[in-house]
Amino acid sequence: MGLESTEAAVRWNNNLQALAENTGFGIPVNNSSDPRHSAGSTAEYMGVTGEPISKWANGIGLSASFDPELVKAFGEAGSAEYRALGITTALSPQIDLATEPRWMRFADTFGEHTQMTIDMTKAYCDGFQTTEGTADGWGKDSVNTMVKHFPGGGPCEGGRDAHYAYGKYAVYPGENFAEHLRPFTEGAFSLGGKTKKASAVMPYYTISYERDQKYGENVGNSFNKYLIQDLLREELGYDGVVCTDWGITHDTGKTEEEFAGKCWGVEHLTEAERHLKALEAGVDQFGGNNDVKPVMEAYGMACEKYGKEATDARSVSYTHLRAHETRRHL
């Protein structure tokens, strides 16, 4: 969404927060955004140069500086601008190892070099999340970062992207699955600043083919209990928010080229059943879903399956999301 002006953004955000305040739950609205700072050769012709925000290189351009301190400075500047606009979660950085040069999302990554990606990930997240002078690093200048895409979106088969059915698989012919995890384990989950780890993680659309070592499922990453619950939550100890990529519970298109839902591996399930499967896998939040009905239907199905008391006891999503909301001192 483009912004007419800083004033318009602030008015819109203030009105939205007032609406949330009047619900009685005391939960502020968390506005998130894909990267807004990238400058490109076509920006002037697309009418986005007037947006009230500074322009920087994209991921691969930031890496070309070979300077993590510069990237941290960008994060500090970017977070100040985001907070001024009412944005409190950055749907970035994209920390996939870009090992497939044909991939259309290559330019948004920090490149193919593992250690460079680790260093840039730390700098980016520390810059966006840290408020200086606070005990835990969180405060009025902090913006949550949502690192993407777990467990690494780079090894896309043939360079085809998983936004489309023809690119639904991530493959590991060289058995380098563990290498693609390093930007998460050594970067996003091991920050140098006081916030310690990226606040949120987004799994990619892909089916990480033959990577499920426990249940043997070839399903999209957000539906894969082994990857989210067993690996990310338990083995790696991640206790932040897990948010799905956009539209994974929606129906697919009629052709492989159609830009539609991305429920890879669970096309046979209903929309509500897909929500339930993702929740059972361990996700907290659904990206791009604007309808609460299938979520409530999934909750009802879970109550029937496990019992209401057990279902409520199993849910830790509220704890993750509440921390995500309040640590920024809204």
Positions of predicted regions on the chain:
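Glycoside hydrolase catalytic-domain context in secreted enzymes
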Residues: 1-322, 327-328
